[in-house]
Structure formats: C-alpha cells, structure tokens
C-alpha cells in the first residue's frame, strides 16, 4: 500500500471537520464562550485520532501507520476548527457597528470595524492592559488583536494534533487483536 493514510482516516477527517463545525458554531454563535473551544481541542483530537484507526480497522500493522492516521485526522479537525473560528472572528471584527443593547448603555460612538471593537475593549476596562501592550489606537489594536487570534489558532491546532496523536496511541495500545491464524470468525 502506497497511501500515506488509510481510507478510514480520511473518513475520520471528514467526521472531524463536522465535529469542528459543530463545536465552533455552538460556542461562538449560539453560546458565545470561546474558551470552551480551547478546552475541547484536546479531547476532540483524542476522539478523532482513535476513531481514525478504528474506522480503518487497523488491527495489526506498523505503529507509524496508526500514528499517521491519528495525526492526519487531528490536523484536519484542528485546521477546520481554526478556519471556521477565524471566519467568525473576521465577520464580527469588521462588521461591528457599535450596536449595544440600550439596557447596557446604548450604542458605542465609533467608526465601524476595528474602532468599534477597540472601544468595546476600552469600555470593558481593558485600557491599561492594552496601553501596556503598546495599543493606543484602532490601528495598533488591529495588529494586536490579530496576533492574539493567530496565536490562539496555533494553540488550537497544536492541541488537536496532539490529541490526535494521543488518540492514535491509545488505539495502538488497546486495539482489537487480529484473529489467530486458522481460527474461524463467526459473522452474523
């Protein structure tokens, strides 16, 4: 076999993409608690790394194939998670027009986009921390904001990939054993 990963790992990668879409949509659009995405990155990788090998029916064979399957599915899941997360971030960053519920003080006075997001951070009491980080206006805030977003994205990909490797390792240790030579397997 000359393929880098098994067919089951490719299928698992698609399942991981679906899992990533579900997680990101749930915790950015429905219940906006972004930290949950970071917390779920490692367990998502563990699940998908194990599933990639179970789906491939990798009962026997070299460890490097088992680990490659898990890493592949973990990377695909992590990249999908980050891609969707960044798309949502771009949408909300550049489309922010300063609207705020009247019960919270009404609309923020700002120019649409980065300036409104910057003003929200200032209103939330983060001005001193931003100033210490060298952020003094919407332009410097934009650079700071996206550096932080890409650093977080790298962390999510790393955790999901590490989880994929861990899931593959767990599968390799606890995988079903191949039937003994000459034994009869009953199929129902």
Labelled PLM ranges:
Residues 128-161:
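Individual transmembrane alpha-helix segments
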Residues 19-23, 77-85, 89, 159, ...:
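Alpha-helical transmembrane segments of multipass membrane proteins
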Residues 1-17, 150, 154, 160-176:
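Cytosolic juxtamembrane helix and N-cap/initiation of the first transmembrane helix
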Residues 84-121:
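Functional transmembrane-helix hotspots
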Residues 3-4, 48-70, 164-183:
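Cytoplasmic membrane-interface segments at the C-terminal ends of transmembrane helices
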Residues 29-34, 55-61, 88, 92-100, ...:
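Membrane-interfacial segments
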Residues 58-88:
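Loop-to-transmembrane helix junctions at the membrane interface
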Residues 1-60:
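Transmembrane alpha-helical insertion/packing segments
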């Amino acid at each position: 076999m000359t393929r880098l990963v098994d067919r089951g790992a490719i299928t698992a990668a698609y399942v991981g993409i679906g899992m990533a879409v579900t997680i990101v949509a749930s915790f950015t659009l429905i219940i906006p608690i972004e930290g949950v995405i970071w917390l779920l990155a490692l367990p998502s990788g563990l699940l998908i790394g194990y599933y990639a090998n179970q789906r491939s029916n990798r009962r026997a064979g070299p460890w490097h194939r088992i680990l490659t399957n898990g890493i592949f599915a973990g990377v695909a899941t992590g990249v999908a998670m980050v891609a969707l997360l960044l798309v949502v971030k771009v949408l909300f960053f550049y489309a922010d027009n300063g609207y705020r519920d009247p019960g919270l003080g009404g609309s923020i006075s700002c120019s649409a986009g980065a300036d409104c997001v910057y003003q929200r951070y200032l209103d939330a009491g983060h001005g001193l921390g931003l100033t210490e980080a060298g952020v003094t206006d919407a332009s410097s805030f934009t650079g700071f904001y996206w550096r932080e977003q890409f650093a977080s994205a790298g962390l999510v990909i790393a955790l999901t990939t590490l989880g994929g490797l861990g899931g593959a390792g767990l599968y390799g240790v606890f995988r079903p054993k191949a039937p003994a030579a000459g034994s009869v397997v009953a199929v129902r």
